[in-house]
Amino acid sequence: MHIRILGSAAGGGFPQWNCNCRNCRGVRAGTLRAQPRTQSSIALSDDGGEWVLCNASPDIRAQLEAFPALQPARQLRDTAIAGIVLLDSQIDHCTGLLTLREGCPHQVWCTEMVHQDLTSGFPLFNMLSHWNGGLQHQLIELDAKPFTIPACPGLSITAIALRSSAPPYSPHRGNPHPGDNIGLFIEDRRSGRSLFYAPGLGQVEEHLLSWMRRADCLLVDGTLWRDDEMQLCEVGDKLGSEMGHLCQSGPGGMIEVLDGLPSVRKILIHINNTNPILDLDSPERAELDARGIEVAFDGMSIHL
């Protein structure tokens, strides 16, 4: 299995366009040893030929240009994107579909709840129906049964419901449902190796731990170091837990969870611009290094 990190930041990217927190100011000025990042998205392939996008970020055009494998140039108009999987309907995970309109029709796998959001509160399916067939919905069932995307038959994909909330625009924002947010367990049928992917993980319940223990590699939510980080940095008033993100530090945090899984490769993704782990010289980054926890970066490649 080939995995390419197209974007590794949370919504807004890093630096965020309107933010002057310590991290954003420092990376712009060149006084912080850190790497700019686009908004979270990955691509998967079973053979390096055809690829599946997992989420389509607002930065998708720049991400595609940075990864030549997605433009094989076999004909006048071409792409190696053979399918799209949406893990939720958050703005920073689906707005890139608008940029991909010239390549319609696209096969888009998502849950019924995500499809409802994207035909009502943010009706991308309706809007793009005017472009050469638009988005063709392929339903993701939450029955723990694996499914396959035809262009990548070597990958077995299982969707796992995560405890989370629908986006602010959603008609059922205050009434969460299974399928608002999912994680993926992806297994390569030939190598037998597997990835657990959950960029929006608010709570690690016991049933999730069983999937995480099975995986060879974890690519999980690294949004915030502290639950009150937005408040501490004076850029927002919400806690990470209120936004559906488990922070890294403290009792029950992501570090504690990952420490209990010593035999797997552990990588954080969806890093918020305020998170001190973006600073390569920070004590928080040193702590991750000491614990064998990696931080995803744009352009990172993983092979399983």
From Swiss-Prot:
Q: What are the BP-aspect GO terms?
A: pyrroloquinoline quinone biosynthetic process
Q: Which UniProt keywords apply?
A: PQQ biosynthesis, Transport
Q: Which Pfam family is an annotated match for this chain, by its short name?
A: Lactamase_B_2
Quote the pathway field.
Cofactor biosynthesis; pyrroloquinoline quinone biosynthesis
InterPro entries named among the record's database cross-references = Metallo-B-lactamas, PQQ_synth_PqqB, RibonucZ/Hydroxyglut_hydro
Span of the secretion signal? none
| CDD domains registered for this protein in UniProt | PQQB-like_MBL-fold (cd16274)
Q: Which Gene3D superfamilies match?
A: Ribonuclease Z/Hydroxyacylglutathione hydrolase-like (3.60.15.10)
Q: Does the keyword Protein biosynthesis apply?
A: no
Give a yes or no for keyword Transport in this entry: yes
Q: Which family does the similarity line name? A: Belongs to the PqqB family.
Q: Which PANTHER family match?
A: COENZYME PQQ SYNTHESIS PROTEIN B, HYDROLASE C777.06C-RELATED-RELATED
Task: Please name the HAMAP family in this protein's record.
Answer: PQQ_syn_PqqB
Function, as annotated, reads:
May be involved in the transport of PQQ or its precursor to the periplasm.
Protein name as catalogued: Coenzyme PQQ synthesis protein B
What is this protein's gene name? pqqB
